[in-house]
């Protein structure tokens, strides 16, 4: 109950324009089963593929940090009309078929009512809970964007300095605490290819036994993957922060969160309290989900998440 209350007060401090028509239970009358339909689709896939939590966390981050949470990432490229989806780091985002299935069922139940942007938000929230993370309410009422341009994509890489990452998050209305929470929480269930952390394999700021293990794995020419959280790889919890404190962060940005004076205290706080992490992670996800949203008459409600209506 306390976490729900905290989230209620969080809504009150978010940008008024974002909250003007976003609210918890937005579809309670227009499509009463909306949230349960999305939850069912996500749960069905989670039973056979627990990695979808990482996929959805990445999908929502990549969507919201490019022109806001408007499902512009979901638009398929066409001949002569490229989109965000196939550009740079977005090329490896996955989970679109789960969004498609949720949309198909929602269109059958409530045609042209539930936005693709809300489906992404709900699916991410539900997958986090399934992976042992916090359960929380999210406001809905987003509309889908009318633009998906690869030139808009400017997402951080795994070697971004902490100071630059702080600036990038600040440009989206997110503070340093939000940044540490979302990066660590998102990476608590993710994987990375060796090519993304080759620079760490000669880094003195990596625990020696982990470094040796990764060097052996990454000697393969097939660019294998490894879990970013070596301790609880499929659970959304605070374990990754403890790993970072023990110099076992895989990506440079992860480890640097524990070394930089502006973020190390936050890492230590989360490492010592999963309760604190769970509360802050729920709050940060809700806050990220309000970045530059379209509401009211702006945008559209897509019939198919992969294409604009016109």
UniProtKB/Swiss-Prot annotation:
Active site annotation, chain numbering: 62
Signal peptide: 1-20
Site positions per UniProt: Transition state stabilizer: 58
CDD domains in the cross-refs: secretory_peroxidase
GO molecular function, one term: heme binding
Entry binding sites for Ca(2+) 2: 188, 229, 232, 237
Encoding gene, per UniProt annotation: PER44
Protein name (record): Peroxidase 44
A Pfam family the protein falls into: peroxidase
């Amino acid at each position: 109950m306390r976490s729900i209350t905290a989230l209620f007060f969080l809504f009150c401090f978010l940008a008024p324009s974002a909250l003007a028509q976003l609210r918890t239970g937005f579809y309670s009358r227009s499509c009463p089963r909306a949230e349960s339909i999305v939850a069912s689709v996500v749960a069905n896939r989670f039973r056979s593929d627990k990695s979808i939590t990482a996929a959805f966390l990445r999908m929502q981050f990549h969507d919201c940090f490019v022109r806001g949470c408007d499902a512009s990432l979901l638009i398929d490229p066409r001949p002569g009309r490229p989109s965000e989806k196939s550009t740079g780091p977005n090329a490896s985002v996955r989970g679109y078929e789960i969004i498609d299935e949720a949309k198909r069922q929602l269109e059958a139940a409530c045609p042209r009512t539930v936005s693709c942007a809300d489906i992404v938000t709900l699916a991410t929230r539900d997958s986090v809970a399934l992976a042992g993370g916090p359960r929380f309410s999210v406001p809905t009422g987003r509309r889908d964007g009318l633009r998906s341009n690869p030139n808009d994509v400017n997402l951080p890489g795994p070697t971004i300095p902490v100071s630059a990452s702080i600036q990038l998050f600040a440009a989206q209305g997110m503070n340093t605490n939000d940044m540490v929470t979302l990066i660590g929480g998102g990476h608590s269930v993710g994987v990375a290819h060796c090519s993304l952390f080759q620079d760490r394999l000669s880094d003195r700021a990596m625990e020696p036994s982990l470094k040796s293990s990764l060097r052996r794995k990454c000697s393969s020419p097939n660019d294998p993957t490894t879990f970013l959280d070596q301790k609880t790889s499929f659970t959304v919890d605070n374990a990754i922060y403890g790993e970072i404190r023990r110099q076992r962060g895989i990506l440079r940005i992860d480890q640097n969160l524990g070394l930089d004076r502006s973020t190390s205290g936050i890492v230590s706080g989360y490492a010592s309290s999963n309760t604190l992490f769970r509360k802050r992670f729920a709050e940060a996800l809700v806050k990220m989900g309000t970045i530059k949203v379209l509401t009211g008459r702006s945008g559209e409600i897509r019939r198919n998440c992969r294409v604009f209506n016109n």
